[in-house]
A protein has these predicted regions:
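Active-site proximal loop and beta-alpha junction motif in alpha/beta enzyme cores
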Residues: 1-230
Length: 230
């Protein structure tokens, strides 16, 4: 039986998909599984209020099991939690090559300052994609216009380079607007069949590569933020 979160738990926080200076990025809460035994993980995520919070087991033989929560639902997979948790585990001195999430095994690598994960586009939630031709119009869309579903709004900024400007609204997950959405980046990459450089939210940056066999590699920068106590 799960019990309410009653205090004394330290939650680590990182920002995922920052720009090259460490700015912007999407905050991720990270709880060690051993610190929240018997606790209500969903209530923990709701109390923290981040777009996602993860509960991570201690790694064994280069693999760590992980569960992912938005403020309202548990997810089988998400991009920014896997990238962020992979970086955090390496920073703790326990790097992994695989994260086990409910959707399946997520391969992890790090190169050129980016943490990269490999995932299937079908692991992403069912996004509705809205392509815009006008960047100014994209910037004016009010998240309050969307009261259900998962909506990814995007426009090319440089089609030749694969550069995209994007926003994401997910009221179904309890997220009015997400700063950086890895799963949506993976899904869009799969739809377009090409690698992308995505700027989302206030200025977060996501990078993808597409494999002809259907796998997508998602990468980004991660920086530590201040931990919080519950």
């Amino acid at each position: 039986m799960n019990t309410p979160v009653d205090g004394g738990i330290q939650i680590e926080v990182v920002r995922v998909f920052t720009d090259a200076t460490g700015g912007f990025g999407n905050a991720l809460g990270i709880a060690r599984a051993g610190d929240v035994i018997g606790a209500d993980h969903q209530a923990l995520a709701a109390r923290l209020g981040y777009s996602e919070t993860v509960v991570v087991d201690n790694p064994r033989s280069g693999t760590a099991r992980m569960r992912i929560y938005t403020p309202t639902v548990e997810l089988p997979f998400a991009g920014h939690p896997t990238v962020g948790a992979a970086w955090w585990l390496a920073d703790q001195g326990t790097p992994v090559t695989t994260l086990e999430v409910p959707a399946g095994p997520v391969a992890v690598a790090e190169a050129d300052g980016l943490v990269r994960v490999r995932a299937r586009p079908e692991w992403a939630p069912d996004f509705t994609f809205h392509e815009f031709d006008d960047l100014e119009l994209l910037a004016t869309v009010d998240p309050a216009e969307f009261d259900s579903g998962h909506h990814y709004l995007w426009a090319w900024t440089d089609r030749r380079r694969g550069a995209v400007r994007a926003r994401m609204f997910a009221p179904a997950m309890g997220i009015a607007e997400d700063e950086a959405t890895g799963a949506a980046a993976i899904a869009l990459t799969g739809r377009l069949g090409r690698g992308l450089e995505i700027t989302q939210g206030r200025g977060s940056q996501l990078f993808t590569d597409y494999d002809p066999d259907g796998w997508v590699h998602l990468g980004g920068r991660v920086v530590p933020d201040h931990p919080v106590m519950l």
